[in-house]
């Protein structure tokens, strides 16, 4: 039976504690792209110290939120479409971020496994209680064992993963009074014009936006079949073994592979094989690549808007399944190496109005690397989180940090129920 979650206080809007500019800010072309019209939703679970005062903790979180919204005041605004529909703006009038407090009969140990369904943990972030959902919503949920879950939702068009982690670490530092607001680095930087369209017309080929034939009923299957969440942890030893396998099966690997290259390749290959797709079906692996230091000049420290493009590895089911892990890792490496300043600028042009390019879903697996964001360091005075993950585990594959295991990675993704057993077996059998 599903565990219950119940609000114990009326939802509130928390405004910045000090006056902030009343203005309308334009989001960048990357921010405004159609692909990012969804929230980033984190779930952090803390083993609360014995005897913690709930009222004091909740008040401390609320006060810290109000203080952190002063430098990050756009998160207290509201996103709207421009009158000419060319992009998005943030109307900043200190409307406030959402804050909720709840109780649940979940325990911290419930989050050490994969959820039973895609939306099992949905009520740990009840954004729908707000008539207009703010760009930032925080929900503090007290668990039955005395631990606490913190659900945080960001509007992805306002902030990316790196930016959200910088905000959360400031928020947490202010909650514990470990740092003064004036001392915190890096200072948040708006400067969204740095990633706007420059009106280029001669653009290169970008496979992430290309369409491939659906030879397998791929879209229908993922839309209609129940998806089952999975969670598998790869430790340092296992990752080293994947690197060895990749080197032994590669035709081009001259340099040692990174953990990301081999793990992404292994997941992609296992996922494809488990779905039993036609040999000629073209598949794509998409993953985010931070461009803060790839564009010229580099973006300023503290830039918290969307500053990533999608790397794209592409091949057929036949080649992906028959050519081994080294081949897959080479495709991932090649996709990373293609991204430089020119490539990133072309993506900006491609997603801008009126082109508005967006990835298709046919044959696509998307990976997002949360394990390197620093979410495992977000400490509100309750210690470091014992679990870091998403509110909902869906078809986006997430790399997550594992507490006290620096080089380990937890992989969460939901796959069609008919394929889940084979997927998990293949993931645990890298030599197969």
Curated annotation (Swiss-Prot):
Its EC number is 2.3.1.268. The active site is at 156 (proton acceptor), 379 (proton acceptor). Gene3D superfamilies: Chloramphenicol acetyltransferase-like domain. Pfam families: Transferase. Coiled coil: none annotated. InterPro entries: CAT-like_dom_sf, Plant_acyltransferase. This is Alcohol acyltransferase 9. It comes from Actinidia chinensis var. chinensis (Chinese soft-hair kiwi). The lineage of its organism: Eukaryota, Viridiplantae, Streptophyta, Embryophyta, Tracheophyta. The gene is AT9.
């Amino acid at each position: 039976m599903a565990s219950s979650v119940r609000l114990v206080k009326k939802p509130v809007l928390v405004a910045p504690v000090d006056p902030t500019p009343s203005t309308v800010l334009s989001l960048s072309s990357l921010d405004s792209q159609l692909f990012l019209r969804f929230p980033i939703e984190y779930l952090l679970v803390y083993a609360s110290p014995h005897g913690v005062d709930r009222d004091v903790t909740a008040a401390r979180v609320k006060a810290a939120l109000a203080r952190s919204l002063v430098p990050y005041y756009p998160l207290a605004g509201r996103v709207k479409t421009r009158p000419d529909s060319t992009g998005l703006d943030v109307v900043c009038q200190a409307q406030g971020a959402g804050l909720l407090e709840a109780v649940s009969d979940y325990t911290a140990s419930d989050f050490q496994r994969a959820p039973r369904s895609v939306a099992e943990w949905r009520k740990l972030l009840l954004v729908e209680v707000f008539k207009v959902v703010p760009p930032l919503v925080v929900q503090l949920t007290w668990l039955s064992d005395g631990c606490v879950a913190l659900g945080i939702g960001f509007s992805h068009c306002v902030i990316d993963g790196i930016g959200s982690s910088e905000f959360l670490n400031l928020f947490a530092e202010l909650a514990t009074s470990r740092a003064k607001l004036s001392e915190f680095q890096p200072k948040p930087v708006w400067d969204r014009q740095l990633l706007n369209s420059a009106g280029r017309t001669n653009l290169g080929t970008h496979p992430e936006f290309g369409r491939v034939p659906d030879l397998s009923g791929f879209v229908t299957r993922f839309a209609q079949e129940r998806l089952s969440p999975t969670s598998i942890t790869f430790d340092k030893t296992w990752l080293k073994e994947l690197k060895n396998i990749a080197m032994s099966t590669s035709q081009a690997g001259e340099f040692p592979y990174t953990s990301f290259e081999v793990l992404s390749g292994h997941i992609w290959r296992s996922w494809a094989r488990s779905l039993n797709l036609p040999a000629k079906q073209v598949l794509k692996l998409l993953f985010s690549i931070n461009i803060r230091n790839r564009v010229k000049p580099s973006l300023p420290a503290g830039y918290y808007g969307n500053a990533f493009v999608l790397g794209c590895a592409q091949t057929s089911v036949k080649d992906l399944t028959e050519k081994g892990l080294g081949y897959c890792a080479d495709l991932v490496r090649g996709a990373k190496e293609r991204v430089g300043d020119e490539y990133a600028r072309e993506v900006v042009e491609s997603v801008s109005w009126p082109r508005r390019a967006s990835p298709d879903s046919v044959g696509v697996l998307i990976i997002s690397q949360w394990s390197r964001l620093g979410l495992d360091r977000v400490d509100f005075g309750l210690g470091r989180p014992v679990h870091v993950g998403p509110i909902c585990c869906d078809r986006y594959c997430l790399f997550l940090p594992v507490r006290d295991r620096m080089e380990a990675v937890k992989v969460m993704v939901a796959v069609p129920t008919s394929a889940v057993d084979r997927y998990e077996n293949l993931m645990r059998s890298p030599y197969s």
